[in-house]
UniProtKB/Swiss-Prot annotation:
One Pfam family per UniProt: EF-hand_7
This protein's name: Calmodulin
Chain positions found as N-acetylalanine: A2
Binding site for Ca(2+) 2: D57, D59, N61, T63, E68
PROSITE patterns in the record: EF_HAND_1 (PS00018), EF_HAND_2 (PS50222)
UniProt binding sites for Ca(2+) 1: D21, D23, D25, Q27, E32
Record-listed Ca(2+) 4 binding positions: D130, D132, D134, R136, E141
EF-hand domain residues: 8-43, 44-79, 81-116, 117-149
Family of the protein in this entry: Belongs to the calmodulin family.
Length: 149
């Protein structure tokens, strides 16, 4: 998993890790983890931090070594990539860049990928995703739709 990180990322993570490894023993406490993550531009919630710690801290000794930290950061980066992919997909559908996917935009994209849909089918797709009932799909509704897949 950590193999997917670039040398630059590993170096950046090592630097951040070292800042919080006060005694230089190659371990950081779980309490310090949130501070390390935030220094790297991540913003995990308390429950996300606890989940990450539980996944990584196999011996439950309350500390995380650098290889464990790298594995965890690689996982976090992978999650971020999928968010970016969803954002890019939304832009493909939102042809006029107004922040919404209309029935016409949905029909156009579906037709361009070879999906021949009737107006009723397109309207049904919009209805399924359209949580606020405004007849179009906003970014948050699109994310919800994509996460269900």
């Amino acid at each position: 998993m950590a193999d997917s990180l670039t040398e630059e990322q590993v170096s950046e993570y090592k630097e951040a890790f070292s800042l919080f490894d006060k005694d230089g023993d190659g371990q950081i406490t779980t309490k310090e983890l949130g501070t390390v993550m935030r220094s790297l531009g991540q913003n995990p919630s308390e429950s996300e931090l606890q989940d990450m710690i539980n996944e990584v801290d196999a011996d439950n000794n309350g500390t995380i070594d650098f290889p464990e930290f790298l594995t965890m950061m690689a996982r976090k980066m992978k999650d971020t990539d999928s968010e970016e992919e969803i954002r890019e997909a939304f832009k493909v559908f939102d042809r006029d860049n107004n922040g919404f996917i209309s029935a016409a935009e949905l029909r156009h994209v579906m037709t361009s990928i070879g999906e021949k849909l009737t107006d009723d089918e397109v309207d049904e797709m919009i209805r399924e995703a359209d949580q606020d009932g405004d007849g179009r799909i906003d970014y948050n509704e699109f994310v919800q739709l994509m996460m269900q897949k």
